[in-house]
């Protein structure tokens, strides 16, 4: 029934390596664009809820608590699905899996739209459909990581994944325009258009995405990426390919028993406290504590996203220049984050505030990308989805939740771990950044050992 999700592996074509390498580019770009545009589109049917909240309050009389319940449903299913759905996707055609999940998510959001009548809503159906949409979207990032990793050489992996990572920045930035266009021009200003129009776009993108590309050059008979680009197959891939390990055995051995993956999981929790803490509370801090105008506060939020866009592109490339030392590069960025948080906290005018938020966006999204890239370097390709998913689960269920609720309570004056007020909030951000540095430093050491070991193996092979 779902045969189109199965992997396709064709015998390697009897052609010279140079010819197969030239044939690689077109199917790679098709596959890359599918996961890039597909993941971007997922944000169009995710962030539209944030944009529509004020209209949902005025049109249907929903309370902040009710809106919070709807959002919480998405966060829980998204966090849980990061591991469950990504585990299922491993061993499947992950390029096909992403547009298929996009289609299912779009259908759910159409159901979400239908639960809003002309003058009344069904809160239960809204929570159910939005939660289901989150569950289906949860594997988008993991499928993208898996697909891109199978197509690209290790020495360029950070660059390709870094460029893909801007898809969510572009999707988040474009969500407002798409939602408002749907409401104002197609539904006479009614809030329901903010959900129906993006969902239709997502359906179209999803069905087109199913037609192009695949999850690996092996699907076209081109051989593995390592063979095409003259790289040694990783130790983890050699081990899983030379044995008849089941998917569960691979998951247990290379994910659950993998010390590096657990280090990255906890590092990701700390990083999400920093990232979401800044993202969630920057406008409130600027207005309440720094006494800046609401317009300047919003400008700072926008510059944080702009800095993230630039940083996402640059940090992956820098880690490639460092020969794949993702942990080391992440530690440098995290140290700079701590210094910049001090400037941001004590900003004496709007220009320092705006500059510090741009710098924080630039710096924070470096480690976020590099934690994911580091994870795929320590697992076989058959476990990339689950490895990326499990760190996402921890980040959303613990880091994201603490950043939104815990930091909010601290800023509001409620003591949490002895911290209170805005000074306590920034202390929590500093502690989280330091915790992330400590864990990433350990990862950097283990990464260095792995790089040197693989270099020695390659030298022996050449000799």
UniProtKB/Swiss-Prot annotation:
Changing residue 436 to S: No change in activity. It is found in: Cell inner membrane. GO terms for cellular component: plasma membrane. Reaction is unaffected by the ionophores valinomycin, valinomycin plus nigericin, and carbonyl cyanide p-trifluoromethoxyphenylhydrazone (FCCP). Residues 1-24, 82-96, 142-159, 211-259, 319-326, 379-391, 447-463 are cytoplasmic. Induction: Expression is induced by external glucose-6-phosphate through the UhpABC signaling cascade. InterPro entries: MFS, MFS_dom, MFS_trans_sf, OPA_Antiporter, Sugar-P_transporter_CS, Sugar_P_transporter. The chain crosses the membrane at residues 25-45, 61-81, 97-117, 121-141, 160-180, 190-210, 260-280, 298-318, 327-347, 358-378, 392-411, 426-446. It comes from the Bacteria. This is Hexose-6-phosphate:phosphate antiporter. It comes from Escherichia coli (strain K12).
């Amino acid at each position: 029934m779902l045969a189109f999700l199965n992997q396709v592996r064709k015998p390697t074509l009897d052609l010279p390596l140079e010819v197969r390498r030239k044939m690689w580019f077109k199917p790679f770009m098709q596959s890359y664009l599918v996961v890039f545009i597909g993941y971007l589109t997922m944000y169009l049917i995710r962030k539209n809820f944030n944009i529509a909240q004020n209209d949902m309050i005025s049109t249907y009389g929903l309370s902040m608590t009710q809106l919070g319940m709807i959002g919480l449903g998405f966060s829980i299913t998204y966090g849980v699905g990061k591991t469950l759905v990504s585990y299922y996707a491993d061993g499947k055609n992950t390029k096909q899996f992403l547009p298929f999940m996009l289609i299912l998510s779009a259908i759910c959001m159409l159901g979400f739209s239908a639960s809003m009548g002309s003058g009344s809503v069904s809160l239960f159906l809204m929570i159910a459909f939005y939660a289901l949409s989150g569950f289906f979207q949860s594997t988008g990032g993991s499928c993208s990581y898996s697909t891109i990793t199978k197509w690209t050489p290790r020495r360029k992996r950070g660059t390709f994944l870094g460029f893909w990572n801007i898809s969510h920045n572009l999707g988040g930035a474009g969500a407002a325009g798409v939602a408002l266009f749907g409401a104002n021009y197609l539904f006479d200003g009614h809030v329901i258009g903010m959900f129906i129009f993006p969902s239709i776009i997502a359906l179209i993108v999803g069905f087109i995405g199913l037609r192009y590309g695949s999850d690996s050059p092996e699907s076209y008979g081109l051989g593995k990426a390592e063979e095409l680009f003259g790289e040694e197959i990783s130790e983890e891939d050699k081990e899983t390919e030379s044995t008849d390990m089941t998917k569960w055995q691979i998951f247990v051995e290379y994910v659950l028993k993998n010390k590096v993956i657990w280090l990255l999981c906890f590092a990701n929790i700390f990083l999400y406290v920093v990232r979401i803490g800044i993202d969630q509370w920057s406008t409130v801090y600027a207005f309440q504590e720094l006494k800046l105008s609401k317009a300047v506060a919003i400008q700072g939020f926008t510059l944080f996203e702009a800095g993230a866009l630039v940083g996402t592109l640059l940090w992956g490339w820098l880690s490639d220049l460092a020969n794949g030392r993702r942990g080391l590069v992440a530690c440098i960025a995290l140290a700079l984050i701590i210094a910049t948080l001090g400037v941001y906290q004590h900003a004496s005018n709007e220009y320092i505030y705006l500059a510090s938020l741009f710098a924080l966006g630039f710096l924070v999204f470096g480690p976020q990308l590099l934690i994911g890239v580091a994870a795929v370097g320590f697992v076989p390709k058959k476990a990339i989805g689950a490895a990326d998913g499990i760190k996402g689960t921890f980040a959303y269920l613990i880091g994201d939740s603490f950043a939104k609720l815990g930091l909010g309570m601290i800023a509001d004056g409620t003591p949490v771990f002895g911290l209170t007020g805005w000074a306590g909030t920034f202390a929590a951000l500093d502690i989280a950044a330091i915790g992330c540095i400590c864990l990433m430093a350990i990862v950097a050491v283990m990464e260095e050992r792995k790089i040197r070991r693989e270099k020695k193996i390659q030298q022996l092979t050449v000799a």
